[in-house]
Amino acid sequence: MPKIKTRRSAAKRFSVTGSGKFRRRKQNLRHILTKKSAKRKMNLGQSAIVDATNEKAVRRMMPYA
């Protein structure tokens, strides 16, 4: 049986934590930053954990993660 290919788009966006959860970046920190407060931009810079409802889909895209 052939190997399953990893979706490269998902591999570039997610990384696996030590406990097996997926880490992701937050959105809204690319442009139009002047109207956003410093506190909001600082919080957007931190990484987040993929929600449980989406974790199954991410795991399917990255079979060897």
From Swiss-Prot:
Q: Name one Pfam family in it.
A: Ribosomal_L35p
Outline the segment boundaries, as ranges, of region: Disordered: 1-25
| One annotated GO molecular function | structural constituent of ribosome
Top-level lineage group: Bacteria
Basic residues bias: start-end ranges: 1-11
How far does the signal peptide extend, from start to end residue?
Answer: none
Cited InterPro entries: Ribosomal_bL35, Ribosomal_bL35-like, Ribosomal_bL35_CS, Ribosomal_bL35_sf
Q: Name one GO biological process term.
A: translation
**Keywords (A to Z) from UniProt:** Ribonucleoprotein, Ribosomal protein
Q: Which GO terms describe its cellular component?
A: cytosolic large ribosomal subunit
- Keyword match Ribosomal protein: yes
Question: What PANTHER family has UniProt attached to this entry?
Answer: 54S RIBOSOMAL PROTEIN BL35M (PTHR33343), LARGE RIBOSOMAL SUBUNIT PROTEIN BL35M (PTHR33343:SF1)
Q: Which family does it belong to?
A: Belongs to the bacterial ribosomal protein bL35 family.
* Protein name as it appears in the record: Large ribosomal subunit protein bL35
Which organism encodes this protein? Nitratidesulfovibrio vulgaris (strain ATCC 29579 / DSM 644 / CCUG 34227 / NCIMB 8303 / VKM B-1760 / Hildenborough) (Desulfovibrio vulgaris)
